[in-house]
Amino acid sequence: VTEEAIQEGNLPVPYGPELIWLWKFAKKLLKGREEVRGRPEPVGRIDWYFSLKGEDENAEIELKGRRRGDPLDLLVAEMMIFANSTWGGWLEERDVAGIYRSQRMGRVKMTSVPGPHDGIGVPYYAWSTSPLRRYVDMVNQRQIIATLKGEKAPYRNNDSELFSIISTFDSNYSAFNDFQSRMDRYWSMRWIEQEGINELKATVVKGDLVRIEGLPMAQRVPGLPELPRGQSVLMKVLNLDYLSLVMECSLIKVLNESHEEDLEEEEIEAEVEAPEAVPPEAPQAEGAEPGNAGQA
């Protein structure tokens, strides 16, 4: 299923005409969100992940990627956003309690109060489409289903149990993200060693935060010169510490490249959250700026 085939109106797969219609609808939804956000969402960004080929310590680490913005990827993402936004607004219209994910001034939070999500570009956003994967989605679906049946919803506005669910979920969600970022970091470092890589290209995200190109890895770089967002730099790998998950690097040079468009994406969530898990005491080589960057 390619964009070219869809635009030509020739998709020789089951339900081809339906998929073409849904793709056009998804593109319209995306355009509307981009107008609200005030900027387009970059396409073509790759989500990197690892798989192991073999067993034990001799297993080969394989780096793989999934490109965002492909037709089916776009279709699923936009349908989920559309459903979560619509159902969130539907609960608010009927004064039924729900759990919302909102973003104002760059800060993302879970709340029982309906509010816009600036990063996505929607007036409401209530996670509801993945009840088998997230407990919050199941809570919202129970609220929706009960209301549709004309029954009393399990939770009321200002329900202390609902606040407890939000608090517990926030804590667990943060712990999961922290664990995931550390695993991404560990396997990125292992892959760097396996491939014998001594130099890495990185992109400045903000301040001393950089992201390694082609790996799901980011870290703070104490002492990094002030550089514009999106600036590409070349880093030298000096040392890898798997126990503390610290990669010591030095700045080789600032490259004549910029990738600001790739950094505009917030993944519809905060991009800088994961790097905070990196130990702040990462060693710095004398006369050099350790750096790395990764990822969204």
Which residues make up each language-model segment?
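OB-fold/S1-family single-stranded nucleic acid-binding modules
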Residues: 213, 242-272
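Compositionally biased, intrinsically disordered low-complexity segments
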Residues: 236, 257-258, 271, 275, ...
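Electropositive polyanion-binding surfaces
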Residues: 1-233, 240-247, 276-296
